[in-house]
Amino acid sequence: TYDEDCLFLNVFAPDTAREGDKLPVLVYIHGGGFTGGCGHEKHFDGPVWPTKGVIGVTLNYRLGPMGFICLPELKEEAGFTGNYGLYDQMTAIRWVKDNIEAFGGDPDNITIMGQSAGAMSVQQHCLSPLTDGLFHRAIMSSGGGVSKLMTPASPEKFYDFWHAVMANCGCKTLAEFRAVSPD
């Protein structure tokens, strides 16, 4: 997840699960301050869920600058900028909603859960109209709630910062910045 090529998820289902079983689904969003972590963290044991009759899904999303860069040039290209990591999460949750039946899961019984930054992500998904109907319950562990970190801000507040980052990398254009290795 320290790379843009990180959009993978893991599905943990009982060996006996079949399409149509309608098992409950738990989607876990990892923490890590939006700069680290991954969907296969050892402290969160996805393979245990199937022993309890639950289908577990863990996901990865873009982190750090790859996930949260905010530039006017990107807004001109795509119509929005910033929060790509949250968009990745939403896309993964939508994939689960659309495909979990094939694993024996119930698309109408999805709980999202996050720890730390994952909990803050869960809070944002609960508030976003873009995720309406994608899940039915939410668990926020060690994060979420009201926080200065989660106070909405306009993208324009971050443009100067990201332009300074570009300049620090010796870049004057978005094309030059895209050519810089993330390493």
Regions found by a protein language model. Name each.
Residues T1-L174:
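Serine-hydrolase-like catalytic core of hydrolytic proteins
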